[in-house]
Every structure is written in structure tokens, then in C-alpha cells.
A protein has these predicted regions:
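Re-entrant/interfacial helical elements at transmembrane boundaries that shape
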Residues: 131-142, 159, 170-184, 307-308, ...
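Membrane-interfacial loop-to-helix junctions in multi-pass transporters
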Residues: 69-75, 100-118, 144-154, 198, ...
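Juxtamembrane and boundary regions of transmembrane helices in multi-pass small-molecule transporters
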Residues: 27, 31, 160-163, 167-223, ...
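Juxtamembrane helix-boundary/capping and inter-helix hinge elements in multi-pass membrane proteins
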Residues: 2, 52-55, 68-72, 148-152, ...
């Protein structure tokens, strides 16, 4: 990648996409005024129209390769299952019962902070932020109405907790990619990474409790049924035990159907209809993921990604500058690809060269890659995490940004770790 000639023009599709999506929202005051899929489609067409030296058939194959990247396909499968589970669980009363159960035991001012902590534990266990969001976002949206806080606020807590696990889990794609590209041990990277982001997690919990104090801590809980809570309870328990997230969500779909049909709240027809409607509700998100994946591949082929990497690497003059450069490399790659795993794989080899050249500990370089990729991924409104959370909660992804405490704070902690050269290693890995 670093040997490819970089071209700033290769980033034109990304620039167009952001301008259309964000610009139209700022101008009209409504971020739904221009459907995000329309912006992505326009940018994708531009990416295919560029580089006239190549045949359209070849460029179409490249686009399809990007759209069909394993990371994209896994996300699509999770989105399909998440839509089906969310709709089926809601139809048989699981969401309402789960919200009322939570309100019965947890004071309102601690509820959102609790969502962050639960999301963090689940994400660490299953290694996927999107799966965690799929399981918890419906509950977060339901709780927000009961305790008097914006849905974007409670959903942002779930996204933040999910990014905590995405960054630290031993089975997360981002962790594996960072460890492999930097040639360090998983346990060593975890310890280093954890020390850097722990203050961000603690500060996030405190902020969530402070901001929740303005809600309605005395919200009255309605009636609930333990049986109806089982689909969500089962998903949470088996996710925490580390089972495959797709298998866990599929099990939740089946359990919701069995309970709903058994107690009469669903018939086979209404159950299957709910599943179909849930999957259909995710269609926009699925299409968007495919378009962004294809567009990212075209930007790579057109030299846009290489331009970003070269632009950052040329400005490095010191060890501290090299660490900042690694952070900049992976952040830029993440902005362009909207996928933190792909961003780490893209920037990883050059980051390894920089760490070797300037004597950066491999544990630190791996942590920087993972921290900044997760910080950016948790903030971009066109990333899978924000989009899926917004889709489930029926809100704009832009509305989640002001409450995205954790992604912002891990970025701040990462910058502090670079400036103050933390943590200080007593022995070489």
C-alpha cells in the first residue's frame, strides 16, 4: 500500500459523500432531508467514473470485491439477524417487559450508566460492537422514554460501551489486526491498551450519571413478565459467556417465537411477519454498508488511501511524532473506509515501519492503532455502529454525536498517552 502513488483526487468520493450527507442536513436543519443511501450512491457512481484508464467492467469487479469484503458480509448478517430479533422481541412484548424490569430494580439516574457497563461487558465477551448494539439498542430506546432522557443519549451509552469491548476484546477483529500487524502478544497489548483507556471508561460512567440526574429518577415501572424477558436475558447471558454473536441472536429470535406463540401474544403468521418487517427495516443499512465497502475499495484503487498514508508519514520527525503519525494514519484510513478493522490492516504495515524506525514499543503502537481506530469508528455518523444504533432507535446518527462521551474520551486519553509517553515500560516486550 505504501508503495502505491497517492492521489488526493482518489478521496473525491468520500468528500462528496460527506458534503452531501452532512451539508444537506446543516442547510435544511434535517439530516433526513437527503437519504444517506442517496448520498452514498452518488459517491459510489463518482468512484466508478474515475480512473478512465480502467474498463468499467474491471472497476465494477473491484467495487464488488470491496462490497463483499468478509467484514462487510459479517456485518450484513448481523444486521439481518438484529432486525429480525428486535422486531420479533418487540412484537411478543419482550422490550416492554425488559424496560419495566430494569426500572423496577435500578434507579433512573443510574440506568444509562448501567447500559454503558453492560454493553462494555458484552462487547468484551463477544468481540463485536455491532452485535452488542443489536442486542441493547432497543432496550436503550425504551428506557430513555421512561426516565425522561433523549433516545440519542441512552443509545450513545450503548455505542460507547460497545466500542470499549471492540477495542479491548481478545476476539475482536480490531485487536487481532493490531496485534498481528505490530507483532506483539495479545495479553501485552491488552494491558497497555487497558491502562490508557481506563480513565475514559471511568469518566464516561461519571458523566452518564451526572447527565442522567436531570431526568426523572422516579419513573414508575409498569408490569413485566419474567418469561417475556427471557429472549433478552438469554441473549445477554450467552453473549457474556462468549458464544458466537450470530448464533446468540438467532437463538433469541427462536426463543421469542416459542414464548410468543405459547402465551398467545403471537401466532405463527404474526411472528414470521414481524421477522420479515424487522429484516426489511434494516434494508437501508445493509445497502449503505455495501455501497461504502465498494466505495472504500475504489478509493484504495484510485490512490486515495495511499495519499492519506503518505501525507501523514512525510511529516514525522521524532518518536513522539511517529506515535502521533500512527494515530493520524489509522484515523485517516478509518475516516475513508468507515471500518476500523480495515483501517488497521491498511495502516498497520506502515505503522510497524515507523515503530521500528523510531523505537516505539510494539505494545504501544498496537494500542495506538486500536484506540484511535475505535475512537473514530465510534464517532463517524456513516459507520456501522452509529448507523445500526440509529436505525434501531429510529433517530438520526448525527443526534447521537453530542452524547458520544466514550469515543471522544478514548481519543483524548490516546493523545495524552502520546504527549506524556504513557504508559512507561520497565521492560521490553
Amino acid at each position: 500500500m505504501q508503495n502505491q502513488n497517492g492521489k488526493a483526487s482518489g478521496l473525491l468520493p468520500l468528500f462528496l459523500f460527506v458534503c452531501l450527507f452532512v451539508g444537506s442536513g446543516l442547510i435544511t436543519g434535517d439530516f433526513y432531508s437527503l437519504p444517506i443511501v442517496a448520498a452514498a450512491l452518488a459517491a459510489s457512481v463518482v468512484s466508478l467514473a474515475m480512473n478512465r484508464k480502467e474498463k468499467l467492467s474491471q472497476k465494477t469487479e473491484w467495487f464488488a470485491k470491496g462490497a463483499g469484503h468478509p467484514d462487510i458480509m459479517i456485518m450484513v448478517m448481523i444486521f439481518i439477524l438484529a432486525g429480525a430479533f428486535s422486531s420479533a422481541a418487540k412484537a411478543m412484548g419482550a422490550v416492554e417487559s425488559t424496560v419495566n424490569l430494569a426500572l423496577s430494580f435500578v434507579p433512573g439516574q443510574f440506568m444509562v450508566a448501567g447500559l454503558f457497563i453492560i454493553a462494555a461487558f458484552i462487547s468484551v465477551s463477544v468481540g463485536t460492537s455491532t452485535g452488542t448494539i443489536a442486542a441493547l439498542a432497543p432496550i436503550a430506546a425504551g428506557i430513555s422514554a421512561e426516565i425522561g432522557v433523549p433516545a440519542a443519549y441512552s443509545v450513545a451509552a450503548v455505542v460507547g460501551g460497545a466500542m470499549f469491548g471492540d477495542n479491548l476484546s481478545f476476539i475482536s477483529d480490531t485487536t487481532i489486526a493490531a496485534v498481528r500487524t505490530q507483532k506483539t502478544k495479545m495479553s501485552d497489548k491488552f494491558k497497555t491498551n487497558f491502562l490508557i483507556v481506563l480513565p475514559a471508561a471511568v469518566a464516561t460512567v461519571i458523566l452518564l450519571m451526572v447527565f442522567s440526574a436531570g431526568g426523572h429518577p422516579g419513573a414508575q415501572a409498569g408490569t413485566y413478565s419474567w418469561v417475556k424477558v427471557l429472549p433478552y436475558l438469554g441473549v445477554l447471558i450467552f453473549a457474556l459467556l462468549g458464544f458466537n454473536v450470530m448464533a446468540v441472536i438467532f437463538g433469541g429470535i427462536v426463543l421469542a417465537g416459542v414464548i410468543g406463540i405459547s402465551d398467545g401474544s403471537l401466532t405463527l403468521h404474526t411472528y414470521l411477519t414481524a421477522i420479515t418487517e424487522g429484516i426489511g427495516g434494516m434494508s437501508e443499512l445493509i445497502i449503505l454498508s455495501l455501497l461504502i465497502g465498494g466505495m472504500a475499495e475504489m478509493m484504495k484503487r484510485n490512490g486515495g488511501i495511499a495519499f492519506l498514508l503518505q501525507f501523514v508519514s512525510r511529516r514525522i520527525r521524532s518518536k513522539k511524532g511517529a506515535e502521533a503519525g500512527i494515530a493520524g494514519l489509522v484515523s485517516a484510513a478509518n475516516l475513508a473506509t468507515a471500518n476500523n478493522t480495515i483501517a488497521i490492516i491498511t495502516a498497520g504495515p506502515l505503522a510497524k515501519d515507523l515503530s521500528d524506525r523510531y523505537g516505539i514499543d510494539n505494545r504501544k503502537s498496537a494500542s495506538i492503532l486500536d484506540i484511535f481506530s475505535c475512537a473514530v469508528q465510534g464517532l463517524i455518523p456513516y459507520g456501522a455502529q452509529m448507523l445500526s444504533a440509529a436505525q434501531i432507535a429510529k433517530i438520526s446518527p448525527i443526534s447521537i454525536l453530542p452524547y458520544s462521551f466514550y469515543p471522544i474520551l478514548i481519543g483524548v486519553c490516546g493523545i495524552c498517552a502520546i504527549i506524556f509517553r504513557l504508559p512507561r515500560f520497565t521492560e521490553k516486550a
